[in-house]
Curated annotation (Swiss-Prot):
Keyword terms of this UniProt record: Ribonucleoprotein, Ribosomal protein, RNA-binding, rRNA-binding
Any Gene Ontology CC annotation: ribonucleoprotein complex
Name of this protein: Small ribosomal subunit protein uS8
Entry annotated with the keyword Hydrolase: no
Family matches, as InterPro entries: Ribosomal_uS8, Ribosomal_uS8_CS, Ribosomal_uS8_sf
UniProt function note: One of the primary rRNA binding proteins, it binds directly to 16S rRNA central domain where it helps coordinate assembly of the platform of the 30S subunit.
PROSITE patterns, per database record: RIBOSOMAL_S8
A GO molecular function held by the record: structural constituent of ribosome
GO annotation, biological process: translation
Self-association state and partner proteins as the record states: Part of the 30S ribosomal subunit. Contacts proteins S5 and S12.
HAMAP family: Ribosomal_uS8_B
Family that this chain belongs to: Belongs to the universal ribosomal protein uS8 family.
């Protein structure tokens, strides 16, 4: 099956698996997905992830994180989509839930969080928001 938005597919898989309290979820591999998962790991939204297999069956196993029985990821929102890209400059970068969540941006300096983009003074494509 062809997926038109692989990033949204990954985010929804993670959200659905965490709402059903699954310990892991598998997503097809891409470098961009791995960079986004790196940020989610660094910010404490997932426990860990590992890349499994060889191309073309390469995939990423994401180990989800919970506080008691409550999932750490409450919700995710895909902002920029293949049919409607959404770009922000450094002044327009949103604060997610007053700083309790994160926004992930693709900038000229790589994929990073909203806080890192503000510190570097760069804008870019607003990929998603996680809280």
């Amino acid at each position: 099956m062809t997926v038109t938005d692989p990033i949204a597919d990954m985010l929804v898989r993670i959200k659905n698996a965490s709402m059903r309290r699954h310990p892991t979820v598998d997503v097809p591999y891409s470098k961009m997905k791995e960079k986004i998962l790196e940020i989610l790991l660094r910010e404490g939204y997932i426990a860990r992830y590992e890349v499994i297999g060889e191309i073309p069956q390469k995939y990423i196993r994401v180990y989800l994180k919970y506080k008691g029985k409550t999932p750490v990821i409450q919700d995710v929102k895909r902002v920029s989509k293949p049919g409607r890209r959404y770009y922000v400059n450094k002044e327009e970068i949103p604060r997610v839930l007053g700083g309790l969540g994160i926004a992930i941006l693709s900038t000229s300096k790589g994929i990073m969080t909203d806080k890192e983009a503000r510190l570097l003074g760069v804008g870019g494509e607003l990929i998603c928001m996680v809280w």
